[in-house]
């Protein structure tokens, strides 16, 4: 029971930060995509822009959320 309370508290504390970071990164990713569409020579810049998009912190955040979810599920169901 105590472990569950600590887990919920940790998720609440880190969750608010995660949500803010994810919103900022979605906005940044959206700006990159909009730049792609608004560019006249977008075929020339496509590979450079896609490289920026795929090295985007959003990808890192998604993978770290999977890791956090895995740890949480292991803690709850062990």
UniProtKB/Swiss-Prot annotation:
Q: Which keywords describe this protein according to UniProt?
A: Capsid protein, Helical capsid protein, Host membrane, Membrane, Signal, Transmembrane, Transmembrane helix, Virion
UniProt signal peptide: 1-29
- Where is the protein situated, by its record's location annotation? Virion; Host membrane
Q: Taking the first listed entry, what is the main subcellular location of this protein, grouped into a coarse class?
A: virion
**Is Protein biosynthesis tagged as a keyword?**
no
Q: Which residues cross the membrane?
A: 52-72
Question: What membrane topology is given?
Answer: Single-pass type I membrane protein
Q: Name one GO cellular component term.
A: helical viral capsid
The source's superkingdom equals Viruses
The subunit structure is:
Homomultimerizes.
Which family would the database say this protein is a member of?
Belongs to the plectrovirus ORF9 family.
Role = May self assemble to form a helical capsid wrapping up the viral genomic DNA. The virion assembly and budding take place at the host inner membrane.
Protein's name in the database: Putative capsid protein ORF9
For this protein's source organism, the top of the classification is: Viruses, Monodnaviria, Loebvirae, Hofneiviricota, Faserviricetes
């Amino acid at each position: 029971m105590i472990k569950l309370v600590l887990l919920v508290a940790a998720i609440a504390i880190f969750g608010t930060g995660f949500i803010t970071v994810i919103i900022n990164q979605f906005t940044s990713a959206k700006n990159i995509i909009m730049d792609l569409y608004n560019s006249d020579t977008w075929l020339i810049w496509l590979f450079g822009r896609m490289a920026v998009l795929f090295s985007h912190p959003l990808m890192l955040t998604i993978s770290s959320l999977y890791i956090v979810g895995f740890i949480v599920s292991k803690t709850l169901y062990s």
